[in-house]
Amino acid sequence: MVYFVALFGGSAAVMLFEAGNVRSAGASGAIYGLMGAVLVVVLKARVSPTGVITIIVINLVFSVTMPGISLAAHVGGLVFGAAATAAIIYLPGVVLHRESRTQQNASRVGWVALVVLLVIAIGLGVVAGSSASGLV
């Protein structure tokens, strides 16, 4: 599910921030989302994030320096993937009281958060696409 949230988040970022009538549905934004997810998990585990951050920075440098690569899709995927993973990991502890923090309740909160992020990503893409084509 994190993959799909990042995929749609990257596509929405392209539609919001790229000039012109650009569409994107490449998997690279989703892959960046998985890198963001790994970063969140590493930070939660209190392990040194140096390796993950290095990989992300190297890939972002490639995104900036190589022609025809959508930086907006990559950054959008990274942000939405990290946000989706943070929602799964941190939100249940924030929303649920200590007595109701069962695995089942935490799972429900995480899934609802993922669905909300997915709807936001798709909604942003639809709004951006509609305004780019003159429908809004």
What residues fall within each predicted segment?
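A detector for small-residue-rich transmembrane helices and their helix-helix packing motifs
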Residues: 1-136
